[in-house]
UniProtKB/Swiss-Prot annotation:
Chain ranges of the UIM domain: 26-45
Residue ranges annotated for the SOCS box domain, each copy included: 586-635
Top-level taxon of the source organism: Eukaryota
Protein induction: Induced by all-trans retinoic acid (ATRA). Induced by Notch signaling. Repressed by microRNA miR-29c.
Pfam family for this entry, one: Ank_2
Subunit structure: Component of a probable ECS E3 ubiquitin-protein ligase complex which contains CUL5, either RBX1 or RNF7/RBX2, Elongin BC complex (ELOB and ELOC) and ASB2. Interacts with SKP2. Through its interaction with SKP2, likely to bridge the formation of dimeric E3-ubiquitin-protein ligase complexes composed of an ECS complex and an SCF(SKP2) complex. Interacts with JAK2; the interaction targets JAK2 for Notch-mediated proteasomal degradation. Interacts with TCF3/E2A; the interaction is mediated by SKP2 and targets TCF3 for Notch-mediated proteasomal degradation.
The name this protein goes by in its record: Ankyrin repeat and SOCS box protein 2
GO BP annotations, alphabetical order: actin cytoskeleton organization; cardiac muscle cell development; cardiac muscle cell differentiation; dendritic cell migration; heart looping; intracellular signal transduction; podosome assembly; proteasome-mediated ubiquitin-dependent protein catabolic process
Species the sequence originates in: Homo sapiens
Note on domains (UniProt): The SOCS box domain mediates the interaction with the Elongin BC complex, an adapter module in different E3 ubiquitin-protein ligase complexes.
A GO term for molecular function: cullin family protein binding
Function, as annotated: Substrate-recognition component of a SCF-like ECS (Elongin-Cullin-SOCS-box protein) E3 ubiquitin-protein ligase complex which mediates the ubiquitination and subsequent proteasomal degradation of target proteins. Mediates Notch-induced ubiquitination and degradation of substrates including TCF3/E2A and JAK2. Required during embryonic heart development for complete heart looping. Required for cardiomyocyte differentiation. Specifically promotes the ubiquitination of SMAD9 and targets it for proteasomal degradation, leading to avoid excessive accumulation of SMAD9.
Amino acid sequence: MATQISTRGSQCTIGQEEYSLYSSLSEDELVQMAIEQSLADKTRGPTTAEATASACTNRQPAHFYPWTRSTAPPESSPARAPMGLFQGVMQKYSSSLFKTSQLAPADPLIKAIKDGDEEALKTMIKEGKNLAEPNKEGWLPLHEAAYYGQVGCLKVLQRAYPGTIDQRTLQEETAVYLATCRGHLDCLLSLLQAGAEPDISNKSRETPLYKACERKNAEAVKILVQHNADTNHRCNRGWTALHESVSRNDLEVMQILVSGGAKVESKNAYGITPLFVAAQSGQLEALRFLAKYGADINTQASDNASALYEACKNEHEEVVEFLLSQGADANKTNKDGLLPLHIASKKGNYRIVQMLLPVTSRTRIRRSGVSPLHLAAERNHDEVLEALLSARFDVNTPLAPERARLYEDRRSSALYFAVVNNNVYATELLLQHGADPNRDVISPLLVAIRHGCLRTMQLLLDHGANIDAYIATHPTAFPATIMFAMKCLSLLKFLMDLGCDGEPCFSCLYGNGPHPPAPQPSSRFNDAPAADKEPSVVQFCEFVSAPEVSRWAGPIIDVLLDYVGNVQLCSRLKEHIDSFEDWAVIKEKAEPPRPLAHLCRLRVRKAIGKYRIKLLDTLPLPGRLIRYLKYENTQ
């Protein structure tokens, strides 16, 4: 039979389970469900039966106590609830998992307070029982009465022990604090009328007024303010009650606080005012209220971030619009020198960017060392990129050196960001607006080659990218474009067709003489050069000797020979060719003199120039000759 717990005016049942729901389950399934239930109960805390019993005894609805940080009283040992189905199953199969201990009966004093039994309390007092003695958690019966909302019991204890009205628990919580947290207004009013201090805070320096604002309890706030609660008290984070009510957009509570003397310009430990909180959290109505009462629209936190900056950062469009309409300064920078337009571009909010463009100083942007174009391109915000370019932002503005150093490749242009992201549309957009593809330490063309994106390569070359790009920090005797394309012969041929210079690949310092041992690739090609040592120039033959490239040495040399005249293979290259008998034809191909037609083709292409190779089709020559010049027919 289920255990019944009766209270005045209501009756609740606990421990009663619908066993028919589980009649169709096998024993294994029941065991599995029991394990899951036990884990859930352990995570949740008290059992369902205990929670139900508590709710019935308190005569409170299930939704009464929704707050995550509310103070809970120390639980006296409750009566043992009957064993449910899951516990029974688990005890049957594993007595070692569940050892149900006999719990002590409930404390009569606590039971009397929970039940609101004033006569029982009076009887205990008459019998000489000391009801002003705290338990191990520092709780008095007065605290229990305030927590459970038993105003009759509270008054009995107040009259019997008036000196305990402001006594604190070990968590430094007073009866006023507990009554406020639980929303028991009659208890709160009774305590304040009896002379309780309204401003005693807990260990976190949170006062009853602060907790009332946290719970959005306007009546409790009104009662506390009427009894002279300090409206400007700060918690350990420096927050006031007004900060808390603003964060919850509670206009009614805000009005009570401001009318009660709350300062609209009070700052927390980080220099944040209530208006800053409203802008940061997107509370437009609270923002309007504070502006009406004279709060500073241009308030800044300790890191110099303005309210407008935070609103842009969190993409609160209506808040940004309101702040700008009230004259907010869009040219205040944070500690990193960034403006609201920077963060809006980084977030990719087109509407906010459009609002900020007319009111943002280009001089301030230049001083910041980073253009909004960089941030939009870095995050692939193409729509914002279009808006900035339409507003005539300089597409070639470089990152400041101190900002470029934050990137390992020392990138500086918005174009580089677009190419790194493999964003073909943004790359084309920037190039159409005049982006210079040759401004970065590492050419964007090399990045495009590494990605293998022919469309991006073609765009960069069409807009003047140097096809013979080198890397200053890792010097080579031959173009880095060839080095990056070596592992893909079709890509290498594509670049050579467009005019890449292959001659330096065969200009070896050692010629037919002995070559020094090749250094390890990890120390030569991948590591950054030492600061106190000038990096040595890597020869082509040295690079193709790397283990990851050497197996392709023959085909690579074969492709390059189609784009050079009479050259001399060094001893190292000959060694590679001789290492595989099928490559013997490559050695024969390199022997001078090269065919006259081939030499003439090279002479014509050189006269045209690598930047005009794409104009070969316009020459007044036979189609067959044009194809030969373009290497479309190499026979």
